[in-house]
UniProtKB/Swiss-Prot annotation:
SUPFAM superfamilies: Nudix (SSF55811). Pfam families: NUDIX. This is mRNA-decapping protein g5R. It comes from African swine fever virus (isolate Pig/Kenya/KEN-50/1950). It comes from the Viruses.
């Protein structure tokens, strides 16, 4: 069993117009299933059940992209112009060995055609993988700024709150650890701009927005990742924090 850990920061504000607590969510540019397939994180077993499940969790456009058998386009969809040539060469060789050499992609296309429905691009809390020797909190702070553009001095960490969630995909366990922060007063305005112009944000994210609890519940009902068990307790913590603060 492989363990993959990501660290995130739930950052909240009190919307001064609606008088509701909101948090920042980001929508990824590609599905986890698509990324796992392109990076060859799968096993080829006799019935291919895990692969078909991966294809089920991809968007229709991602499945169509794989059916072109053009690995350069698949790789570019994730990495855009990031120069990772050594990793690209390694993954391309594995893709070619698995799918192109045996039958020029016929088996792969047949498996994709067995997929039913379509996955969605996840809305999630800004998070990422820690670097070597990086603490959990330092990782959460760095990833949050990379994905939102909001600097460390613009919010306050609430150290008493820390939550985690785990789920399994095939032989991989995904563990997410979350810290909590509240925005400074000057950034609570409803129309505070969230920009996608920063290079890292363009590469990883398609949308970024403030969401209240009603929106979080709606999003969670329409995607595989349920955010409510994490964001619900965070909002309750913020309510108590603001009550005692004032």
């Amino acid at each position: 069993m492989q363990l993959k850990t990501s660290i995130g920061l739930i950052t909240c504000r009190m919307n001064t117009q609606s008088n509701q607590i909101e948090t920042i969510l980001v929508q990824k540019r590609y599905s986890l299933a698509f990324s796992e397939f392109i990076h060859c994180h799968y096993s080829i077993n006799s019935n291919h059940s895990h692969l078909i499940k991966m294809f089920n969790n991809m968007t229709i456009n991602e499945r169509l992209l794989i059916k072109t058998l053009d690995f350069d386009r698949m790789w570019y969809h994730i990495w855009i112009e990031t120069p990772v040539y050594e990793l690209y060469h390694k993954k391309y060789q594995k893709f070619k060995k698995n799918w192109l050499i045996p039958d020029n992609g016929k088996k792969l296309i047949s498996l994709i055609n067995q997929a039913k429905g379509s996955g969605t691009l996840l809305w999630e809390i800004p998070k990422g993988k820690p670097k070597e020797n990086e603490s959990d909190l330092a990782c959460a702070i760095r990833e949050f700024e990379e994905e939102t553009g909001i600097a460390r001095e613009d919010y306050q960490i609430l150290p008493a709150f820390k939550k985690s969630m785990s789920y399994f995909e095939g032989k991989t366990e995904y563990k997410h650890i979350y810290f909590l922060a509240v925005l400074c007063k000057s950034l609570e305005e409803p129309n505070m701009n969230l920009s996608l112009q920063y290079e890292t944000r363009i590469a990883e994210i398609s949308k970024i927005s403030w969401q209240n609890m009603e929106a979080v519940r709606f999003i969670s009902k329409h995607q595989s990742l349920n955010l409510e068990p994490i964001i619900g307790p965070a909002f309750n913590f913020i309510k108590n924090y603001l009550r005692y603060k004032h």
